[in-house]
Amino acid sequence: MLVQASNGNTSIKLEGILWIKGSGKWLARANQEEILIPIELAEAKETVEQGGEIAPRQISTNVRMRPSIETAMHAVLPHRVVIHVHSINTIAWAIRSDGIEELAARLRGLHWQWIPYAPSGIPLAREIELAVARAKETDVFILANHGLVVCGQDCAATEELLRAVERRLAISARPFPMPDSAVLGNIARFSGWQYPDHDSLHALGTDKAALKILKGGVLYPCQAIFLGLEAPTLPSTFAASKLKARLTGGEPPSFVVVERSGVMLNEKMTSAERATLIGLTEVVRRTAESAQLRYLTREEVAKVVNEGGRGYRDEAETQQRANSATAVEDIRTPREAEYTATRACPSGR
């Protein structure tokens, strides 16, 4: 799984223009709708140097999207083609305190660097600039507590590099005990909450290691943006008479983890929340209970949520009706999904 909901972004530089995914757009819809925005590359680089906000080039009255929050990172990279994904395999390594050491052997022979965690936008772009200055040949960047960036001079080569990294970092998902249908059925009866249609979600409640990891805190920004600052949990034994108030009082969460039983979903859960939860589940299923993890600090989480996180979430959720059938699709042919059409990457050249 390379992307979930509207996360991940791609770009291509053509004749001085940086074509970048619009904020809130879903890569899974790249063949069905316009998702790219044209940016003047020279102006974008200058804006990054000044620490300003990058604006789209107004070459069309139909451009109503904001550039991706990662536009600054794409602008400072010298490569013609850039693919940034939230690969569940990469993230499972990128959340580890010993991630650099663990990846050294797996990525041997590739030109890669580990980028310490930095908030998306100008701070992350600065870290990328420093990395490129250290080693200009770098074309694979592992973003701590975030994801993966691969780069190249043409679409085909960049796609193949992405696949190569995925093969090297692949981790088998840990099996999990079956959910307790009696307990979950009781929740549905008293609260109206829904049983997930994606069985792996139950691992968050039935797999001891997954639950422990989940309770530890926020592993990466999209988790906080779409799913909240902590996972809502219920003990395996609870008073059914108090259940409805627990799940519906105030602002109810989009999901609840029932310890040793499974997971239930709020009927109002959005496609973006669902896709993010599936991605989170697949990450923790690939993370060993004994792994030394590096969770985001309170300050880092607050910065994510308060500085653009809510707006990013709102933009992503405006796409939920169109994306209901493709919320968590893999990009099977990245050249197609990245650049919307052959117009942006003609014949893969």
What is each model feature region?
Residues M1-E329:
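Glycine-rich flexible loops
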Residues P346-S347:
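Short, intrinsically disordered C-terminal tails of secreted or membrane-associated proteins
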Residues T342:
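Residues immediately within or flanking Cys/His clusters that coordinate Zn2+
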